[in-house]
Structures are given as structure tokens and as C-alpha cells.
């Protein structure tokens, strides 16, 4: 078992792809909230939360998970990534609102409209990996 968990909610598959890519690069465990919602966080020092956005809001499964685990998350290093279609200020506002609602200060967005890496994901994912890599 690793000391990093990536917990995500994905609708069309982009958040899942990003989660799996990050996990492969840093050696993290992944949990898809469509399949598993009861996750023992006590094994992990770092939690990376991932979600897509619909109508400006994060996917409900992740919101429910954060609400249910708010106390356990306080003792962890928590990061949030949001997969979205926007760039620039609109994306910054969107991720800022989501992070604020969750009480998370370490948050980034990955735009589907940004430059891609070799895995056809936003190059910003690689920058994020360097930031969270143990």
C-alpha cells in the first residue's frame, strides 16, 4: 500500500485517465467513487481528489465523499484537481470556488483545451505531478 491515495469522480473518462496517469507516475492507490465510497483514509498521508465539472459544479460523488470525510481529511496533505473545458480566469474562478467549498487550498485545473503531453493529457498534469511527487 502507498501513502498517497487518488480519489476521483469521473463521468466521461477524462478525470479517470488523469487519475490513473498521476498514480502511475507517483505510485499512488486510486479509488473510483463510482465503484467504492467507503475508503479508509488512515493509511494515507496525502490525498489527491479529482473531479470533472458539470454546470460549474463538481461531480456529486466527490462532494458527498468530502462532506462525509471532512474530519479525516483535516489531518492529511490534500490536493484537488479539476478537469474542465475552460482556461484562464474562468477556470481559475471555477477551481477556486470548488476548492473553497471543500476547504482545500492546494487546487489546480486541467483544461481539455490546453497543450497536451505524450499521454494526450494537459501538460499541466506533469507540472502537478512534480509538485506532489514524494
For every predicted segment, state its role:
Residues 2-5, 16-17, 21-31, 43, ...:
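FMN-binding flavodoxin-like domain, especially the glycine-rich phosphate-binding loop
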Residues 10-16:
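Glycine-rich NAD(P) Rossmann-fold beta1-alpha1 loop
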Residues 33-36:
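Conserved SAM/SAH-binding loop
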Amino acid at each position: 500500500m502507498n501513502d498517497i491515495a487518488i480519489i476521483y469522480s469521473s463521468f466521461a473518462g477524462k478525470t479517470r485517465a488523469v487519475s490513473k496517469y498521476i498514480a502511475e507516475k507517483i505510485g499512488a492507490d486510486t479509488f473510483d467513487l463510482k465503484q467504492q465510497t467507503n475508503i479508509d483514509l488512515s493509511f494515507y498521508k496525502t490525498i489527491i481528489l479529482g473531479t470533472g465539472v458539470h454546470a460549474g459544479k463538481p461531480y456529486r460523488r466527490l462532494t458527498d465523499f468530502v462532506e462525509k470525510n471532512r474530519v479525516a481529511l483535516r489531518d492529511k496533505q490534500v490536493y484537488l484537481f479539476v478537469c474542465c473545458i475552460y482556461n484562464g480566469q474562468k477556470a481559475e474562478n471555477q477551481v477556486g470556488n470548488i476548492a473553497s467549498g471543500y476547504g482545500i487550498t492546494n487546487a489546480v485545473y486541467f483544461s481539455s483545451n490546453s497543450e497536451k503531453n505524450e499521454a494526450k493529457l494537459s501538460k499541466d498534469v506533469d507540472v502537478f505531478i512534480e509538485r506532489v511527487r514524494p
